[in-house]
Amino acid sequence: MTDDSKDTDLSEDNGFPTDYEIAQNADMTPIWDLLEPWDLGNDDLSYYGEYTAKLSHDAVDHLREEAKTRENNLILVTGMTPTPMGEGKTVTTVGLGQTLNHLDEEAMIAIREPSLGPVFGVKGGAAGGGYSQVLPMEEINLHFTGDLHALTSAHNLIAAMLDAKLSQSDEFDVDVNDISWPRALDMNDRALRETVIGLGGESGGVPREDGFLLTAASELMAVLCLSSDLEDLKMRVSRIIVGYENDGEPITVDDIDATGPVTMLLRDAIEPNVVQTIEGTPAFVHGGPFANIAHGTNSLIADKAAFGMGDYLVTEAGFGSDLGAEKFMNIVCRLGDMTPDAITLVASVRALKYHGLDMWPADIDEINGAGVDALEAGFVNLDKHVTNLQKFGIPVVVAVNRFPNDTDVEVNAVLNHCRNDLNVKAASSTVFAEGSEGGVELAERVIGAVESSDPEDFEYLYPADATIKEKIETVATEIYGAGSVNYSTDAEDDIERMRELGFDTVPVCLSKTFHSLTDDARQKGAPTGWTLNVRKLYPSAGAGFIVALTGDVLTMPGLPADPAAADMDIDADGDITGLF
């Protein structure tokens, strides 16, 4: 499951144009003209239509050099625990970037690219919305530049080469019950979560249990997004662990001779994609790891390129601060040698009411009908996210993403609570409805936060040489609010294996539900004293971290009874409806 199910929604019912109508009426600039001020020409760009391009490896190297002459102010956008409808994190990211440019600051935007699974599932297409969206929306949400297809092919090539070794070679004494590399598909399909393969007799391979995960959940996605260049990508691919021999020795991608062909398939996919916002701000849309399974941010290579084009980079981390932001700080910043200068925490009146009503599942009508008492009861969740972020030593600005049903009394209650009780900067944001005009106060607060920031104040939550359990327990108690951690027997065995393999000095990536600060999606607010249950651990050796599975997170979602796909169509002229 991915992030915000649908960012801010102002429908035609109240006279506001739909995202689709806004996108269709946008005055877009050809991508070659958009990028001309940075001396990026035909030799630097691979074009995918009139409004999308990939930057060549040489162009990225050039921009890395240019970045040394710029300020490199990094702004991370995250959020409180969202409702299933989403609170407008991407809208705020896009709107803030546009507004900084509106204020004559040179700003770039970097976000993740959508996965087809969620697009056709509960989310529908989205890359922002209203007057703070990234274009061309249809292309971005469908095949885009083919990155997800390349990743799917590369992932399944590894699986095929592993099974070929298993059935046609005695090179490895493979433990068929300890193969850790399933197949991948960029589509939500619950029937493929658990499969049995090799049932075609002697010529059909070795019978064994297998399964599928969503392409965005593949370790290859995390590897792509954490690689600095093609050479680094190849090295990371080579060390991915795909299974184990009966004596416990790991089998890597390099062991099955797949490093070269897999990297070959990803040669173009590692090149960052550049598009534009509705106001003409360049936007990198590249990579899409989930924040509840992997680290949840766009590619490092896109970030590094963006630093060469502007003094500000606005990027987002998936879900709430407990997931994407924590991993951005402890994994991405550590591996990418970056330090945020300010954090924008997106909150909304409806999310606060959602937590104040202690509601599961969400009932939007009941949320909208609730009063200020429910809003104030939900402050506990916002407070926890602010506290979480302050642990890293970075200035925090709360953005109250305003929806049409929000009253002045409600919005002011949130702003006053932030300013007076939490002592943090806060501003109302209407960038969905007004574009950059609706984000001026927020942008000014963020600029002030950047100017007051001191990189020396930044600190990781835990040292790299802490034990695996110490890292897990630090995140659980400091970020989630847990009182203790319980490890299953399998998890204990996995930890011992991680130690033996030498993975006890890498960051941990906790896989947890995004619906709650706890590992139970039903729990709202900010519970304390509860027990986090860790059921399994495995190494993402290529990415460079350990994944600890908690609760019941799925790597292959299923379509709902009424999927977004059912409302999509295309006419004889090729015009699409219902995508977003």
Curated annotation (Swiss-Prot):
It catalyses: (6S)-5,6,7,8-tetrahydrofolate + formate + ATP = (6R)-10-formyltetrahydrofolate + ADP + phosphate. InterPro entries: Formate_THF_ligase (IPR000559), Formate_THF_ligase_CS (IPR020628), P-loop_NTPase (IPR027417). ATP binds at residues 83-90. Keywords: ATP-binding, Ligase, Nucleotide-binding, One-carbon metabolism. Pathway: One-carbon metabolism; tetrahydrofolate interconversion. The keyword ATP-binding applies. Its EC number is 6.3.4.3. PROSITE patterns: FTHFS_1, FTHFS_2. Signal peptide: none annotated. GO terms for molecular function: ATP binding; formate-tetrahydrofolate ligase activity. The keyword Glycoprotein does not apply. GO terms for biological process: tetrahydrofolate interconversion. Belongs to the formate--tetrahydrofolate ligase family. This is Formate--tetrahydrofolate ligase. It comes from Haloquadratum walsbyi (strain DSM 16790 / HBSQ001).
